């Protein structure tokens, strides 16, 4: 199963890299043309308005490019960093942000090797460089003893950051973290996402949403549009290939309070993920959200929000 998954990813990378060599219009790590990038950014801005709370957007210069950070919530609130899922960007938090920003100072960061408003000006980053990049952002904002929420791939990055000897993280929330405790649970089902990248179409996109969400009809149309354009226009990269489940020792090194949430129809995680989390994370709580898929923060927003807020406060 895993071999099938990685073969599909490799085929995707070969096809898209050949296409980018042939059709590249300008120097951008993510997008082929200026018009495609602008169309995507217009969709991003529309989706971000779904936050429906006051926020500011800031760009932070780093050693590897520009980090785009969206800030919201009370200035005297405890700092809460949000790391989104793959290709989802910080706009994905629209069903959760009002609850999260009520008592916390939010720092939502777009990952610089994916579609979004962060921009990569260096070569693709290694895991070590990803840690450096985020730490530069944390240092810029002088974040100490902050809480962090990571969704899907953002959950994997969160565990990567928390497993470092020197970090300033306090409480951790993982929303169906990808490739973190085990490899993807249902490889054949998730292959729809890879096929979407290979041959993007509205039909394949909707099928992918049906795979990852129990209630795709509840996903806002503006956010759907942005997410679709991310899959349609963005070049693929090999970062997913570098994601491996963390070792027993790496997980045991994390002493922070951790909450792990997955959906009962999750195609990325299963109860085995929660069992391993409970076994090797020394201070861990887990919960399975009913009638939710991998997109549990959208499928069951209120239940997810309540569980997260109760844990953080």
What kind of region is each of these model predictions?
Residues 2-4, 10-13, 18-78, 313:
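Alpha/beta-hydrolase fold catalytic core
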Residues 108-149:
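Active-site loop/oxyanion-hole signature of alpha/beta-hydrolase fold enzymes
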Residues 183-188, 198-253:
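Conserved alpha/beta-hydrolase catalytic His-Asp/Glu region
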Residues 254, 260-262:
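Short beta-strand/loop motif that positions the catalytic acidic residue
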Residues 292-301, 305:
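Catalytic histidine-centered segment of alpha/beta-hydrolase-like enzymes
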Residues 265-269, 294:
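Acidic catalytic loop of the alpha/beta-hydrolase fold
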Residues 68-116:
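Conserved HGGG/HGGXW glycine-rich cap/lid loop of the alpha/beta-hydrolase fold
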Residues 156-164, 171-199:
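Flexible "cap/lid" loop of the alpha/beta hydrolase fold
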């Amino acid at each position: 199963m895993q071999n099938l998954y990685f073969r599909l990813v490799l085929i995707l990378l070969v096809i898209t890299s050949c296409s980018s060599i042939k059709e590249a219009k300008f120097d951008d790590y993510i997008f082929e043309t200026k018009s495609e990038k602008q169309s995507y950014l217009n969709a991003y801005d529309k989706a971000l308005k779904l936050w429906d709370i006051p926020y500011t957007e800031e760009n932070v210069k780093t050693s590897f490019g520009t980090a785009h950070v969206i800030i919201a919530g009370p200035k005297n609130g405890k700092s809460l960093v949000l790391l989104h899922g793959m290709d989802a960007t910080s706009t994905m938090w629209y069903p959760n942000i009002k609850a999260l920003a009520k008592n916390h100072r939010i720092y939502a960061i777009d990952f610089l090797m994916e579609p979004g408003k962060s921009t990569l000006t260096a070569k693709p980053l290694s895991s070590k460089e990803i840690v450096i990049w985020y730490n530069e952002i944390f240092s810029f904002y002088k974040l100490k003893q902050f809480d962090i929420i990571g969704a899907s791939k953002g959950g994997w990055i969160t565990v990567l950051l928390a497993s470092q000897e020197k970090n300033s993280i306090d409480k951790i929330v993982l929303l169906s973290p990808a490739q973190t405790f085990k490899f993807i649970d249902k490889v054949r089902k998730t292959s729809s996402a890879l096929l979407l990248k290979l041959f993007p179409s509205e039909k394949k996109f909707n099928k992918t949403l049906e795979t990852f969400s129990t209630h795709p009809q509840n996903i806002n149309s503006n956010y759907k549009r942005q997410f679709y354009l991310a899959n349609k226009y963005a070049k693929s990269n090999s970062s997913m290939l570098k994601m491996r489940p963390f070792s027993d020792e790496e997980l045991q090194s994390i002493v922070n309070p951790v909450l792990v949430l997955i959906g009962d129809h999750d195609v990325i995680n299963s109860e085995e993920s929660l069992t391993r989390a409970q076994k090797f994370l020394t201070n861990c709580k887990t919960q399975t959200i009913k009638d939710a898929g991998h997109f549990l923060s959208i499928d069951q927003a209120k239940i997810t929000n309540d569980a997260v807020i109760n844990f953080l406060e």
